């Protein structure tokens, strides 16, 4: 085991503070509408240019182990805020820096760190409660666009496209962000339920120009097993042929003789048919088949519930207005399911989302929910260069998280104003002793730091602006983009309450831990001596004796 170096008390905290300040100073340059860019070096290719706080934080690693610990702890603040609300990373970093700097001054003056932390925690709880009261619901498209614009560093086109996507797919819909191929941002919306399975044979294609199979007003046969024997399917195929409607088969797999027979029947025009594999695997496949059944008003043919393929009738089949199948995807449009059943299924999935602890499961459940309740929108980010594309995509993702958070918990006035207004919650707040009161006062000062930083980045005088904002009330604040004072909500400067709350909670949590640090342990880095050169191989022997 390598030898360790241990630092105690003040010398440990000083080292940690250096790391905190290095990381926070780099990150806070990006805050606000006039935030600056940070250039990140890459081991290969062009450097990345970003105004995204968490991207900057992730890149920073310091040489000194003790300073690096401080930097990594602040990085954790940014990550926690990002995990909770998907945005607010820079705000969280600025708050954490202010709490740690103020807190360590108090500790150096001889205060009890544990009581300081208790004071900070008390004040945080009160401010969070006040933020929830200040929040107003974010319902209309205009407010959603404004939130997206602010989060995307004042890029209106991004705010607009996100609001449009949310309007089209609803609050439950899935919105994904991809790299586009043009210069402009594009939005494409998939109506109905789409899953990532294409046709099992290209012979099912009936639209050669688009290489797609389109079925109008089809019946859907949903089977939870492999189909390899055509005899099992004959009764249901005959019934479908008599009904004169196309058929889509969704099964675990269709292979061999069964697939060949379907292809031949389709090509001869005896029965218009297409087959695809069921989406997902294992239990998730069963659940998704059930989703399709509920959406189309059909029944999954499964031996688990005592249904066999031989006994399937037209009553077991689902109905849809149209189905489009290409090489990669199948889209079911306007399923004929009963609305009450669909709503019950949506409620059931929502309950599962609340109960699951796995992020992966939550994401998959969210997708299933969107396919049943809303739709799927894809935002394709356009840019002139690869570097700009990456930077823009990160901002679009941030803005998307921010708008979701706004819909969830409402909005508060932006530009650091909400935190200043929430200070009234701790005006009369008293701790159990004087040191807790110092902790409360410390947070009171720290909470102003985001507003100060936004103003400083815009090139104005922070103290003057903070004083003027404090004299106002309600939504009154400072628009750093234009240098005008006024109603922040009317000027369209909004922050999601969840983002502001998560940023403060993450900063107070880790800031409190740093203040109460008494010792730090790190591995001693030994300078390895340079390797010597290769030994001389000596001259080659003479070649005497040759004529």
Swiss-Prot record:
Keywords, comma-separated and alphabetical: ATP-binding, Chaperone, Cytoplasm, Isomerase, Nucleotide-binding
Cellular component annotations (GO), alphabetically ordered: GroEL-GroES complex
Coarse class of the protein's main subcellular location: cytoplasm
InterPro entries in the record: Chaperonin_Cpn60_CS, Cpn60/GroEL, Cpn60/GroEL/TCP-1, GroEL-like_apical_dom_sf, GROEL-like_equatorial_sf, TCP-1-like_intermed_sf
Family designation: Belongs to the chaperonin (HSP60) family.
SUPFAM superfamilies for the chain: GroEL apical domain-like (SSF52029), GroEL equatorial domain-like (SSF48592), GroEL-intermediate domain like (SSF54849)
Binding site for ATP: 30-33, 51, 87-91, 415, 479-481, 495
Gene: groEL
Protein name (database record): Chaperonin GroEL
């Amino acid at each position: 085991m390598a030898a360790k170096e241990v630092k105690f008390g003040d010398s440990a905290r000083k080292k940690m503070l250096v790391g905190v300040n290095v990381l926070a100073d780099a990150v806070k340059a990006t805050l606000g509408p006039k935030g600056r860019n940070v250039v990140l070096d890459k081991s290969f290719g062009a450097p990345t240019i970003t105004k995204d706080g968490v991207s900057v934080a992730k890149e920073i690693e310091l040489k000194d182990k003790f300073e690096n610990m401080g930097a990594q702890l602040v990085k954790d603040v940014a990550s926690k805020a990002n995990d909770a609300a998907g945005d607010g990373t820079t705000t969280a970093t600025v708050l954490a820096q202010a709490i740690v700097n103020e807190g360590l001054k108090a500790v150096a003056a001889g205060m009890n760190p544990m009581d300081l932390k208790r004071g900070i925690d008390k004040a945080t709880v009160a401010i969070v409660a006040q933020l929830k009261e200040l929040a107003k619901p974010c319902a209309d498209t205009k407010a959603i666009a404004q939130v997206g614009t602010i989060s995307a560093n004042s890029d209106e086109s991004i705010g607009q496209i996100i609001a449009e996507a949310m309007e089209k797919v609803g609050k439950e819909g899935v919105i994904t962000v991809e790299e586009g191929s043009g210069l402009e941002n594009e939005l494409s919306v998939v109506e109905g339920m789409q899953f990532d399975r294409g046709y099992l044979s290209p012979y099912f294609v009936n639209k050669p120009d688009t290489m797609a199979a389109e079925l109008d007003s089809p019946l859907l046969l949903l089977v939870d097993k492999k189909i390899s024997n055509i005899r099992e399917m004959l009764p249901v195929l005959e019934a479908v042929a008599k009904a004169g409607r196309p058929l889509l088969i969704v099964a675990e797999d269709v292979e061999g003789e069964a697939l060949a027979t379907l292809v031949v029947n389709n090509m001869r025009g005896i029965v218009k048919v297409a087959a695809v594999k069921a989406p997902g695997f294992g239990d998730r496949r069963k659940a998704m088949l059930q989703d399709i059944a509920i959406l189309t008003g059909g029944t999954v043919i499964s031996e688990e519930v005592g249904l066999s393929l031989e006994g399937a009738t037209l009553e077991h089949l689902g109905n849809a207005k149209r189905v489009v199948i290409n090489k990669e995807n199948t889209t079911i449009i306007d399923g004929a399911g009963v609305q009450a059943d669909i709503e019950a299924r949506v409620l059931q999935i929502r309950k599962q989302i609340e109960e699951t602890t796995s992020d992966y499961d939550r994401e998959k459940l969210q997708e299933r929910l969107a396919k049943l309740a809303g739709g799927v929108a894809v935002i394709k980010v356009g840019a002139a260069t690869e570097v700009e594309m990456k930077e823009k995509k990160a901002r679009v993702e941030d803005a998307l998280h921010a708008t979701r958070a706004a819909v969830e918990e409402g909005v508060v006035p932006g530009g650091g104003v909400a935190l200043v207004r929430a200070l009234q919650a701790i005006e009369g707040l008293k701790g159990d002793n004087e040191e807790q009161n110092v902790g409360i006062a410390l947070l009171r000062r720290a909470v102003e730091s985001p507003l100060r930083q936004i103003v400083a980045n815009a090139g104005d005088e922070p103290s003057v602006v903070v004083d003027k904002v404090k004299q106002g009330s309600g939504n009154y604040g400072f628009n750093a983009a234009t240098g005008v004072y006024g109603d922040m909500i009317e000027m369209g400067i909004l922050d999601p309450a969840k983002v502001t709350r998560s940023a403060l909670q993450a900063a107070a949590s880790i800031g409190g831990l740093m203040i109460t640090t008494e010792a730090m342990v790190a591995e001693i880095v030994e300078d390895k001596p340079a390797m010597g050169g290769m030994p001389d191989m000596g001259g080659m022997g003479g070649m005497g004796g040759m004529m």
